[in-house]
Structures are given as C-alpha cells and as structure tokens.
Amino acid sequence: MNAENLEFPDASFDVVFSSMFLHEVPRKGIEKVFAEARRVLRPGGLMLHMELPPNSQLSPYDAFYLDWDSFYNNEPFYKPFRDMKPEEVCRKAGFDPKKYVQYVIPSIGWYGEKVWSEAVERQDSVDSDKTGRLTEGVRWYCFGAWK
C-alpha cells in the first residue's frame, strides 16, 4: 500500500507510526504521508515517527557525519530529510503546532527495559541539548503530533 494514498477510511486509527522510513521518501512524498496520517487518525490520535535527527538539532560534527553517510551510502533523500523542520511539516499537514512532540529515547535493545522506562517516565528527553546528539550507545529521535 502506498503511504501517500492510503486505502483506509478517514478516522480509522488511534496511532500512525513509522520507523526509519521517512528519510527514504522525497520531500513532497513526506508531506503527502503526513497529510494521509492526519486523515486516517481519529480525533486525539497520535502520529509518531522514529527517524534521523534534524540538522538543526545536531552539532556541526554530527551533521557532517550524517551528511557523509548521505553522500557516500547511496541515500539521496537522507540529507534533504534532515534539512527539514519536522514541526513545520507537521503544521503544513494540518497538525496543531501546540500538539507537536519530539523525544530522544534510548534503545531498549541496547540499554535494557529499566533505562528505557525511566527515560519515558521522565518525559524530559525533549531538552535541546539532548535532542539529536550522537552519543555512545543507541538513541532514537522520535517526533510527531497529536490530532
């Protein structure tokens, strides 16, 4: 099924989730995916994407590191995706900017359930000095919006 043109009726789901998908899609496609996600979400539903962090939230070194991967690993949409402002794309798809969310969470597989649960419970992973940083271990950048 094409994520830009879903076959589901309006207001079908409480959650729309993707994992490491959007950076494989051109910008115009991402805008359509977000609009479709909003369409199929029920009121109060959540659109959430686990993805690469945006360049605006990376140190110059970390941005260079990911840019290198984009240019030399056959990833044509990787850098353009990271140049986007996720909150702006959500807004353009019709999501309320006040309902935008972003988190950096540790990988449950790397750190274990206890550390993961503590990070989720704290709900402070949006701190700008943590968001998008490439650190020891595996951490995932997540963003989205409530409908």
Language-model-derived ranges and their functions:
Residues 91-147:
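Core SAM-dependent methyltransferase catalytic element
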Residues 31-43:
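A short glycine-rich, Lys/Arg-flanked "PGG" loop and its adjoining helix->strand segment in the class I
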Residues 2, 17-20, 51, 102-104:
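Active-site proximal loops enriched in glycine and acidic residues that flank catalytic Cys/His/Asp
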Residues 14-28:
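A short SAM/SAH-binding and catalytic strip from SAM-dependent methyltransferases
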Residues 48-112:
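C-terminal alpha-helical "lid/dimerization" subdomain adjacent to the S-adenosyl-L-methionine
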Residues 5, 23, 27, 54:
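Active-site micro-motifs of SAM-dependent methyltransferase domains
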Residues 4-16:
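A short acidic, Gly/Pro-enriched loop at the edge of an enzyme's catalytic core
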Residues 1-5, 32:
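Class I SAM-dependent methyltransferase SAM/SAH-binding core
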